[in-house]
Every structure is written in structure tokens, then in C-alpha cells.
Amino acid sequence: MFKTSYNLYDLNYPKNDSLTPIRDYKNDYFHKNDDKLPEIVRKPTRKLSKHENKLNDKKFTNKRPASLDLHSIVESLSNKKIYSPINTEIFQNVVRLNLSPQIPNSPHEGCKFYKIVQEFYLSEVEYYNNLLTANNVYRKALNSDPRFKNKLVKLDSSDELLLFGNIDTIASISKILVTAIKDLLLAKQRGKMLDANEWQKIFTKNEVQQQLYSTFDISEAFEQHLLRIKSTYTSYFVSHQKQMELFTTLRMNKNHFFNKWYEYCLKESGCIKLEDILKSPMKRLTQWIDTLETLESCYEDILSPELGLKLSPTRRKYSLFSNKLETEVSEYKSNSMYNFSLTPSEIIQSYDEDQFTHLLKPPDKQNKNICNASRQESNLDNSRVPSLLSGSSSYYSDVSGLEIVTNTSTASAEMINLKMDEETEFFTLADHISKFKKVMKGLLELKKNLLKNDLSGIIDISLRRINAWKKVIECERPSGAFFAHDNLISTMCSSYIDKLHEQKNQVTILKLTELETDVMNPLERIIAHCTTVKSKLKDLQALKKDYMLFLQEKKANVRDIKRDLLGMHFQNLQNQMKRELPVFITLIHDTIECILLNYIKVFLKYLEIIAGGKKYLQKDLENMSLNDSIATGQIKNLDILQCYSKSRYMTKRMVRKDWPFPGDPSGSRVVRKLFEL
């Protein structure tokens, strides 16, 4: 007899992988009027002990089933109505209790999967080493070798940064991926090398594959890699076209130095071409997607279902990223002025930012602190200049030239505030007054020169000349072959005069509208404010004598209310001028900068008008591009030279053969000078 509180069934409790059903499964579980429906099972708030679980389940184990035939369980459960009180999903899971994970029966089943992993691992290592070659061989020779230094591109220039882009960052990210896969394969055994022997163990040993079955989460490594490459590869993809254009330009324009540098680097790198390295990131994304697709097709029985099913979402994420890259590259090509390195908030902020604030350099006195600030400002001004090809000037071609101007503008604004603080601390009121007088004198001189500048002067000179020539042409002359084309010439003169009058009208409108509104009116307002400040300075100078008397009386303990009021007024006015005059001078510099920029815009429009308008400028550009497309050695403005030579030849022939006046034309000194007889 057993001395225990458990009955015999409790001692003989079935093991986990067997099933003890509560009744015969071939009969209905319940009927419509059944009064023995199961109670709602509530989850306990605490973990029950093993003994309590057995006691709770005892009522289900007392009645043994009539049959233990379990073949029709799945079919009967699938035919069960959906509103059945039995949780069929849980019951189906109970049928397959704690099945042991299916692992490769032989190492050959996992060999194909890990062969693919090996190929990808070795290709990623090769990709990483090739990227390092671009920096350690090509870039190093370009910067360090005296034979090539500053010959092709300048050190740390934007052209150099565009040529090599952010390859070093891409290489470091690939190294992280290689390290992650290595740690997964070696079960994070530090210091161990993934050599040929380790690969052979992975291919042949069943124990190693069983260990990797539930630990080799390669999809997680790819997921982390995708997070790292998004911004880096986006920047590289959108600048790749300009990168290759710069490479071609250097090869064409600096052929001698380029060939020497390229030949030397080919020998050092083992004949790895730079253009192949630069194109490799563009192809690598497709290779990652293909690798994930191949791994997804053969992971069964090699990885656990939890790890294997993660490969498909990872591959879809890479495909979406690839499509997004193609879209952004196409948008970048269609709108080259768009800067992909800026965030939306930075783009919105840049609308109101002045790109030329870094040009502001207000005059100041020479002192130690100001010199230091000037040196810092000069260092900012000597920063990298944006490339014409790249449109970008960041270290990784990830930040555009616009962003450098913005950063320089911010730094310059901070430098101005620093100067204002130093001026307040070290400069006296007399220094500020002296500077203000110079500034006001310069403003008056600027206004005088702008008023003196007659924009219509060039057109008036052209009108006087063409009118004089027209009078010469239309003077009374005898009929003859020499004057056969006089009507045509007269018509051309008239049309040219009409064109000049139209240009003069456009210039007059430009002068009365944009020049007056954007340049002259703001300048006059600044001068008016300066006049107000100048009057206050005169008041300050007039009160100075009374203030001196006030100080003397105060020292002698003599009180005069009038003197006291004048003295206090002088002190307040003096403090106000010392506090506000430096700020006002800085505002003058800011305003004058905007005025000059507006004047430049107006002057560019003026040049466009006197050049003949946009149509003529467009024709000139087309002619220039046509001349550039023709072989080198083509003479510029050949059409003008040909027209001039033809006209001169025809005129000389008319003078020699069809001279309508009496006498030999070579006998006249004027005719000989004009027509080189």
C-alpha cells in the first residue's frame, strides 16, 4: 500500500508528449440541452504548484475514454462549428505536445545553405577590402605623393570629396556586417578566426549545425545593416552620377597627371580599377537582395521556423529600400537644385535664411581680441569651396554647398555678436562715434555714385552712333552699283534704332521700379536714420559743457536744479548712445549688404536687357554649346568673323571695280585708310 496523498493515477501521470482525452472523440462532445457545459476557465493570478494543477485537473482524468484512436482528431476538430465552447486551436496544439525540433539528420542537408552563407561572407569581405583600396591607395597617393599632390585636385577640396564620396563610411558599415555574421557562425567566440577549418566544421559536423539551428539569426544582422546604410547609400546613390562625371573630366582635362597617378595606383592595388570600386556600391544592394532570396528558398530544416520566417520580411524591406533609392535618384536627376542631404525642417528654414551673411565684415578697430576673432572668421572663409560638378561640399558628399553657406552664415552671425560684445566692452563712445561718422560718410558717397550712374548712357551712345551712320547712308548720292543695297541697309538701321528705343524704355522702367524700390528707397531711409542719430550726437556735444559745469558744482556741493537736470539728461543720453550706437552700426552693415545684393540683381537684369533679352542670350548659349561640342581648336565667334570678312571683301571689291566717282580711289587718303587700298 502506498503511503501518499496521491492516488495511483497521480503517481502514474502521463508524460508530456502523450495524450489522455477526457472521452471518446468519435461521439459528440456536447448536445444542445447538455447541462454539463464546461465552466469558464480563468487564469490564476499566481503560478500554481504542480500538486494544485493535478488536483484541478483530477475531474477530467477520472473517466477514461472508450477509445484512444486519435487519427480523426484533426478532421473532427476542423468540422466543429466556430462558436463551439471548446478552444479548438489550443486542442490542436495539445495534440502535438512538445515535439522535438527537427534538425538536419545529416550534415549534407545544411551544406548547401551554409555554402551560400560562405559565398556571401567572402564576397562581402572582398567588397569591404576593395572599398578600403580606394582610400588607402588611390586617395592616399592623391594627397600624400608629391608627384600628384594638388595636381589633379586640391587637398581636402570638394572635388576630392566628391570623387571618393563616403566610401570609408560604407566600408566601415560592411565591416560591421562581416563581423556580425562571423560572430553568429562562431557562436560569439571572441578571438576565433573564421578560417577554412571552421567552415569545414560548419559544413560537416552535425553538432555545429544543431547549435546554429536556433542561434544563426542572419536576418537580424541584415536588419541592423539596413538601418546603417539608409542615409549613407542614399547620399552615395544621388551623387554617383556627378562623381563619375568628375572622374571623366579629370581623365580628359588632366590627361598627363591622371595617367601617371592611375598607373601607379593600379600597380599598388593589384590592378583594381577605381571606376569599378566607385560603381560597386551601386551593384551591392542588388546582391544583398539576391542573397536573401536564395537563403529564403533553402532554409528549411536548417534554421528554426522562427529564424527562417524572418528572412522574407527582411528581403521585402531591402526591396522597398532599393525602389526608394531609384525614385530618389530619378527625382534628383530631374531637379538638380534639390538638396537631398537636408531634412524637411532644414529646407523650410533655408527659405528665410540669407545665404550671403558670411560676406558681412563690419569695420572695426585693431586690437588683440578682434584680431583673434578675425583669424577665426578667416578660417571659416577659407573652408572648402563647393564643386561645380558636385553641388556638394560635405565630407561624404552628404551635405550640399547650400548647407556650407548656411553654416558659414550662422558662424558669421555668431562672430558679429562676438564683435558687438567686444566693442561694447573695449571701445569707448568716442570710438563708436568716429566709426559712425565714417559709415555715414560712406553711405552718402554710395548714394551719390548710384545717382550718378546713368543706366541709359550706353544705349544713348549707341543711338547717337547709329543715327550718325544713318545720316551718312541716307545722304544724297548718285545711282550706281555701289549703292544697290542702300535701302536694305537703311531698313536695318531703322529696325536697330527701334530696338534701342525699346531697350531704353525697359531700362527706364527698371530704374523707376526695382532700382528705386529695392535700392534707393532703403538707402535713403538708412541715411534718414543716420541723420537722426547725428542730431542726437550734436545734442550730446552741446550738453557736454553744461555737464562739465554740473560735475564741478557737484564737487563743490553747489546745487542748481537746472544744472542737475541737464547733467542727468546728458548721462542718460550718453549711456543710450553707448549702448545702442554699436547695434545701429551693425544693422547698417546688414541693411547695406541687402541693398547691394538687390542692386546686383537689378544690374543683372539691366545687362540682360542691353544684351538683347533672353532670346538673344539663349542663342548665345546655344552657339557656345555648339562650339564646345565641335572638335577642339574651333575658333570662337566664327560666324561674326565670317560675316565681317565677307562684308569687308565685298566693300573692297566695290571700291576697286565699281567706283562711281571721278578719279582713282587710291588717290584719296581717306579712302585708302578706310578700305586699305
Swiss-Prot record:
Top-rank taxon, per record: Eukaryota
The protein's role, per its UniProt record: Promotes cell fusion during zygote formation.
Domain DH: 112-326
Subcellular location: Cell tip
Single biological process term from Gene Ontology: conjugation with cellular fusion
SMART domains on file: RhoGEF
InterPro entries: AH/BAR_dom_sf, DBL_dom_sf, DH_dom, Dynamin-Rho_GEF
Gene Ontology CC terms, in alphabetical order: cytoplasm; mating projection tip; mitochondrion; nucleus
Keywords in alphabetical order: Phosphoprotein
Protein name: Nuclear fusion protein FUS2
Main location: other
Residue list for modification Phosphoserine: S67, S72, S84, S100, S106
Record GO terms (molecular function): guanyl-nucleotide exchange factor activity
